[in-house]
Amino acid sequence: MSINAVDSKKLVEALLGDLRLLSQEAKKKQNHVKEAAESGVVRIRNISTASVGDTVLITNLRAACTELLHPLVLSCETRHTRLVQIALQGIQRLVQHRILSQNGATIVTNELWSLVEAECEELRVLQTVPPLVSSELIVTGNTLAKCIVMCFRLHFAKDPIVINAASAAVRQLVSTVFERVIQEDGIFSTELTVVNPSGGRPSPRAAPPTLRPCAADAYMLFKDLCLLINGEAPIWLVGIQETTRTLGLELLESLLKGFPSVFIRHTEFGDLLKDDVCPLIIRLFSPNVKAMHISSQHPSSRTSNASFNNYPPTISHERQSFPISMRLVRIVTLIVQFYQTILHTECEIFISTLLKFVDGDRKGWQRPLALESLHRIVSSTDLVKWMTESFDCRPNSTHVLEQVAIGLSTVVQQCLVCTTFSSDQENEIDRSQEDGGPGFLSKGLWVPYVEHLTSKKTILLDSLDRMDAVAIPEGYVLSRCCVALCDMTQAVYAAIDKLCLVDENSEAGSSETKLEIAKVAYANSQPSILAAIGSLLAASTDEIVSDQLLCCLSTLISAGCRVGADADLHRSVYVLAIMSLPSPSYLNQFAGIAPPSPANKRDAPVSEQVFDLEAWPSTTQVTASGPPCPCPVVSTELWNKQVLLTSKNLQAARTFIASITTHIKELNNLWYLCMATCEHLSWLLAMRPTQVGQFERETRDDHSNVPTVVTNAALSDIAMLSSLMDKVAPAIAALPDKSFLSVIDALIRLSDESLAVAATGRESSLFPLAVLYKVCSLSLMRLQVFWQKAANHFIKVCNHTSVSMRDWAAVALTSLAKHAVKSKTSMDAKSQQEMIISSLLALCSIPHIQVRRRQLDCVMSLMQTDGAFLLSTSWPNVIQIISAIIDSDTECELSLVRQGYLGLRLVSSDFLQSIPFDCISGLVEAISRYSKQNTDQNISLSALTLLWTISDFIYRKMESVGNDASEAVWMVLYTCLSESCVDSRFAVRKSACQTLLQTVTAHGHALRSAAWHSVIWQIMIPLLDKVRSQTRCASTEKSNGELIMHHSRDTEQKQWTETCIHTISAISKIFNSQRKSLLALNDFGAVWEAFLGYLDWAACYENAELSLSAIRSYQEVLLGKISSQTLNVNSHEKSNGSDSTIDAITPELPQAQWVESWKVWLRISRGLARQGCAAMANSVNADSKSISSTPRMNSSSSSLASLAPGIYVPGPSHLTAILHVFPPLFDKVAKSITVDDLKYESLPAVLESMMNVPIPSEQAPFVLPSATTHLTPTQEALLEAVKIVFVECTLSGTSLRAAIPDQIRLLLKFASMATQRISPNKVAPGGQKSYRDYALTTIVPFSEYSLRIAIEFFTSTSQNPEVANSLIAIDIIKFLGEPLYMKYTCISASTWKLAATSLMSVLRTSIPYARQNPEVFRGLWSAICDTMERWLFTPNKSTRLAADERKRDELMECQAIEIIRSEMLAYASRLPQEDVQRLIALLHRGSISQIDSTDVLDSHTQRNELAKACFDALLMSSDGAHTNTEEDEGRGILGNVAVTSLLQRCTQVMSDFCKDWSAAGDLRLPRSRILEIISALQAVDSLIARLARDPKMTELYSHLVSLFPSVVDVMPCCHADPQLEHQLIKTIKSYQTLFLLQNIPQATVE
């Protein structure tokens, strides 16, 4: 050991310190010590100074060891306490830093011995000796012995502290001695060769010469320990005066336990064990050994050996025997564990001794002590293996392993036997049960269980500090046996497992030898262990203990499987099986399964060997009760007997199922036993298998006579058992073929037993079927191995009388078939499918419905999931299975029909390509059967759809099969469909018609031309005739069927109407899709006319749906498209809008057919209008008081609140739909019709009558205007039609221009709806809001829009002679007079304003042309005067308006006055005189204020601007008072009239103003009055100025002079306004000019 620089320096300083301290302490009395210490100080300093390095320093100190020890030894010799302490401290430093040499060690040892002898500083001596010995090999031989003796002697000192320290020192020194041996062996790997001295044997008092020094010391030490234990004097440890046997045994045990390599490597030590230790132990075990107190001393001592042999006893033999025996047992255990290879016979003796202790317990602690030792032995795998190899496998040797197992088993049996039983014991049992503690209960004997026992955790073997045995807990022996047996079982299994492992490097034949050893180990231990475990398990009351025992039992089964011990395995499995069931005799009594024969024929059966039938415990918690599973081999009287299943049974059941699952490959002939046990378990726990082979708890059992009762406590266990049972089938599926078939046979045997039970009417177990199904489903890869056997059994069960068994078998067979079809096997696909499907086909002979249902389910599943894998040869069987449902006696079973049809539909939809074409006819026939059956109408309907699918398939196959073959199938298909078209059931009839017509539509082009003539005249047209006839003749009585039908289909007539609708629609599609083929027919015209005649009838039929459908079909057949207009009355569409129509090309059609279609359109439109008007008339006659049924001009403003039953009114949707046909149809026929077709009596009358059709009240709330045009769809369509006609009439070169006025008149008719008077009690259609609100949103926008279009049409064509000469302008002006007259009383103010602007537009357009043709337009001027008068002077006054609104309205009137002035009065000479007079009178009337000047409340009705405009017009018209030419003569006449009217107006204004001024007093007159009089004064100025320019106007001069007084009258009032005053002054000044002209009249006269 190297010492670093720091340690060396510290050592020098510490030594110097110790020496100085010695010098200081010894200077008074111990002068020689002082001098020696000082010399030592000097010596250390010199060494330290002279040493260059640390290593040299240590070396020099070690060389001077004797000199350094001198002062320390002198100090010890003084026996002075303080000096001795300091000296021992220094010695310890030298020992610690290994400064001592071997001589120095001897000196120190001798001095320490002297201190011990003197009893001086014993504790410090003990602190010094162990480091001295253990530091280096400087203490050997006698010196070492001396050190050990010192510690032994101090072990018996008086001070307890010293005793304890000495005890520890002894143990340390003894261990150190043997550790030296291990170190020595590591240093010297070769053997030490020693030559014996010549002439004699080695001395017995010395170590063998073959040992090295350390080994020799250890040898002598161990030998002396044996001598001391045996009470003899030691040889090497001279000086030991006394010791104890317990200490010696403990030291012996520590050496045996800690250093087994020393004893095994060195034969000398092995000889010591064999010659000294074992005989010593045997002698001490002997009952003749008496307790002795060893007080030996050194042989040289005075007491000599006599004291050894004659020691007085100090303690009792009883007390002395336990610690000795306990230590002996510990040593024995160690010897067996570590030295069995070198002490073969001795170990056998020791084990036998322990077994004897176990067999009889005379002292109360011997049996548990021996059991603890045996427990440690049997829990070792290596020891079990050694016992088997060394003893049990040898023929003439004692079977030690067997004896140990028997011994433990015997103890168990003895502990469970109660010799006496008292009431106190019974009370104790009750208390223990109440406390819930674990334990064992057998025949009234309660043995508690001591928990947490292991082989290492013991009570007696660990009592090293006790002189007496501790109190043994009650039940300790049985508990220790229980744990020992469990551990032994595990050790046996581990040993077997190790022996059975295949070692590739092992020699040939060694594997067989090992296997034989394993078999012997199992055979010798299994019977006893099984018996003991069974007894303990039966008596156990604790779940954890039972679980341990069950685990042990499972391990026995695993070991038996490993070695292939069939008989022993059978017994183990049987024991576990009967533990899982209510009683040991259950299998024999209720299942007819006899127990296995015992190993010895003279022994009782296993069930009686292991279990005491009378002592079978009943205190375990009962979890289930009920009758046993019925078995046909036992008496039926036992079927109703009640049995109890306990929680322990469930525990065992878990272990049982887990064990058989784990070791299923090794069970061989035990399949029936295992499966029967599982069957009875599942029955007793009411665990019923599910349809997929899983097990679950059944909530109730209604079929059993005595129901099974399962407590809630068992539910969790049942769930676990279910999970475990589910794992059995996968384990079976992994077996090889031979074992697999054995399991199948066992399950079939159990199933046959269940069938026999079910035949008696009792419920039987489904367990065999479930497991058989599950096993087969997991083994489909070897289908050929089991299919025939399993399938035949399932088919057999399918024909059984038991419903549940039958259903289960059907489920199993069909499920297997579904999975087997796609499984990969060694068979070819054809053979595999034939084998599987033939099994399914065999089920057709079974009449039971549920079996056939399962059969069909399977076929469906096969087609759905694996249809692609079905070969062509399999399809005939598949179709035959499906068809057999209708052919068999079960054809009336609804569920089967439905299920069969599903399969048929699947074939038709997904697998037509897989079916050979020659099978299509059979498929069609099968579908036809399903369509004709009366069980389920829905299936009949759906079957017709399948024919449509087949038609597609036939079409696709035409190229490959040829036209002849395909047309033959077509005709068969059409024949089948035509038969269904006349079915009495409405739905079937409807579906058949649709299918037939859709098929023709889709695939009709596949027919050749010759076939089409027959299709039309033999199928289509007759079908239409028949449908029409049936519709007319159908009953209108409501159906009394059980089904609740919608009101729209609750009569036969309604149903036939629906059929008619679908027929029309379908044939229309045929005419479009097959137009090219039909046009090729020679009689296409007749075909077209016949079909349009049918559409004409249907469109005008008194049914809304049929009528609308016919109109849409009419549109489709003409245009190849359908408008978006349906029964949704709010659908808007433009004829030229591509976004609102279905993109389609107009079908080709000859012009003659287009004209025919035009005529049909007119007939349909008239018919719809006629029906609406007739309904209106009927409604009025039925209820003249009904306000909502009063006729109106337009459908937008009229509705029918109530109709008589059966009265039909075409709705807006019908009108809109037929109007949507008009634009494209008119475009086709416009060049082929005459103008008479567009005159008012023709097309406009039709359109007007359509607007007269009332809205049914139920539809009115849903007729909503467009968000953009604010028009309803019908209104938009009508106006669109008028626009299209107008555009056509305006084209150049057209002959239809004369029809333009008729179109304008029609629009005026539409516009007149806005001028209707609204009565207070008038209600809107539908009655949801007021009529005014309804009119504002629906009527007014349409009327105004019509008026705008009419004005637009007129203004754009007014110059055309046809339009102008029609005098349509007069009609327009007259019409406009009505809204202008109504003015503010119109529904909407926008109406009269639109009329005003329209009037001005018409006047500007028509007046210039009328002036050029006065004779033609003579009636125009009076119409204008009438309209203007009605407008300007209407009595319909407005409510208060805002100022800006009033100004805007007045401005329009002023604009009209301006037009009259500029366009009419300016050309008065060309107008009739009476009309001019009316116009002047209008202007005069308009210029007069018509309000009371004192009435300020009506001041808002003043029209000052109008009055001013009229006044200005009069004024300007007065310019024509003097003319020369003929044209001016007329204007002069107008001027004179105007002047007269103007002067009258001025006079009146000034007079009224003065009068009102006087009456107003201090109040100012309105500003308008002031402006009015200013205007009058300005007019006087203007007339004076005009007279100055033309002085010849004498009449004007007279009028002006007459007016002057009125002007002067205004002067008092002129101060009212500065402007008025200024104007008055100016006017008076103007009279100067008039006065200057006073002679003009004379001049004129001259």
UniProtKB/Swiss-Prot annotation:
Keywords: Golgi apparatus, Protein transport, Transport. One of its GO terms (biological process) is protein transport. SUPFAM superfamilies: ARM repeat. It is found in: Golgi apparatus. Pfam families: DCB, Mon2_C, Sec7-like_HUS. InterPro entries: ARM-type_fold, DCB_dom, Mon2/Sec7/BIG1-like_HUS, Mon2_C. GO terms for cellular component: Golgi apparatus. Belongs to the MON2 family. May be required for traffic between late Golgi and early endosomes. This is Monensin-resistant homolog 2. It comes from Caenorhabditis elegans.
